Amino acid sequence: LGWLAVPVLFFAVIGTVNGVNFTDGLDGLASSVTLIVAVFFTVVSIGMKSGIEPITGAVVGGLMGFLLFNVYPAKVFMGDTGSLALGGFVAGTAYVMQMPLFILIVGLIYLIEVLSVIIQVTYFKATHGKRIFKMAPIHHHFELCGWSETRVVAVFSVITAVMCMVALLAL
């Protein structure tokens, strides 16, 4: 990436951290999506013998335990501290493994969540009050369209799993 490495790193980290934070709006959404991404990083790190398997594996284990209490109806919530830490984990792991552009693939849900907010705010200001989505981030739009909370989480998790498979094929 040359001289673009620093600005790309900056936007990738900020975007990923905020993307995970925006995703943390439904019971189990951020934790289930990030669990799938963490499994992807664990599988890839084992294949690459990168040495970070204990870290990625610990995050997988931690998220599995956390999800027991975070799925609908949630008894425990991660809050900003948890979601920002998970975003930092995803961005940091991608960079340590020298695959920062893979964040766009495996973190597609994070990207969509951030873009939905940016698009909504920009359009709202440009049109003096009109909206593209019923609500942003987009997981709330789907809720207002009649999807249950568990359906949104399931669909977003399946999309993440498919994108992780695509990323594995791209290696």
Can you annotate each of these PLM segments?
Residues G2-L171:
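Alpha-helical transmembrane segments
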